[in-house]
Amino acid sequence: GKFLHSAGKFGKAFLGEVMIG
């Protein structure tokens, strides 16, 4: 639960960086 939740947050932030980058 914790890992997946954290991974989800990180994934969204990462995708945001990729889109902007």
UniProtKB/Swiss-Prot annotation:
<comment type="function">
    <text>Has no antimicrobial activity against tested bacteria.</text>
</comment>
<dbReference type="GO" id="GO:0005576">
    <property type="term" value="C:extracellular region"/>
</dbReference>
<protein>
    <recommendedName>
        <fullName>Magainin-B1</fullName>
    </recommendedName>
</protein>
<comment type="similarity">
    <text>Belongs to the gastrin/cholecystokinin family. Magainin subfamily.</text>
</comment>
<keyword id="KW-0964">Secreted</keyword>
